[in-house]
């Protein structure tokens, strides 16, 4: 007997409901024109990396727990004396999620992490880049359930960029609204 292949909840919802809703709303000529999620990039910059070189590895470990995938340590491209940064010095971590991990992360982000953010009033609907990608920032990484609040010695912020195949911001906004992103009114 063949085992049932795992499919993330949001991907199933996209295939069964969201594609049809977007097709009705924008009446695309071709089924391949319907926008979909391409990737999610999570970036965590560590400003204190100049004083302590171990900070980026600690941040990378937290980011790995959040994303479920090993992050890449980002390094400074050039030296900036004012910030005490040297070329090739580790200054942060980033991870690119695609496929099932992307849908799982988005599910946790929308349903668990964003409601736990203090004084959350909704996402800024103007944070689109003009080409269908959405960027947002989170000030504290402890809103994710994978991070144990008691074991955290320092809180870091992170940038989350949701890349879609949509060509306009309106299409991307409609796609993310269907995924129940809580946009500000």
Swiss-Prot record:
The keyword Transmembrane helix does not apply. One of its GO terms (biological process) is translation. One of its GO terms (cellular component) is ribosome. Keywords: Ribonucleoprotein, Ribosomal protein, RNA-binding, rRNA-binding, tRNA-binding. It holds the Pfam family Ribosomal_L5. It comes from the Bacteria. One of its GO terms (molecular function) is tRNA binding. InterPro entries: Ribosomal_uL5 (IPR002132), Ribosomal_uL5_bac-type (IPR020930), Ribosomal_uL5_C (IPR031309), Ribosomal_uL5_CS (IPR020929), Ribosomal_uL5_dom_sf (IPR022803), Ribosomal_uL5_N (IPR031310). This is one of the proteins that bind and probably mediate the attachment of the 5S RNA into the large ribosomal subunit, where it forms part of the central protuberance. In the 70S ribosome it contacts protein S13 of the 30S subunit (bridge B1b), connecting the 2 subunits; this bridge is implicated in subunit movement. Contacts the P site tRNA; the 5S rRNA and some of its associated proteins might help stabilize positioning of ribosome-bound tRNAs. Belongs to the universal ribosomal protein uL5 family. Part of the 50S ribosomal subunit; part of the 5S rRNA/L5/L18/L25 subcomplex. Contacts the 5S rRNA and the P site tRNA. Forms a bridge to the 30S subunit in the 70S ribosome. This is Large ribosomal subunit protein uL5. It comes from Rhizobium johnstonii (strain DSM 114642 / LMG 32736 / 3841).
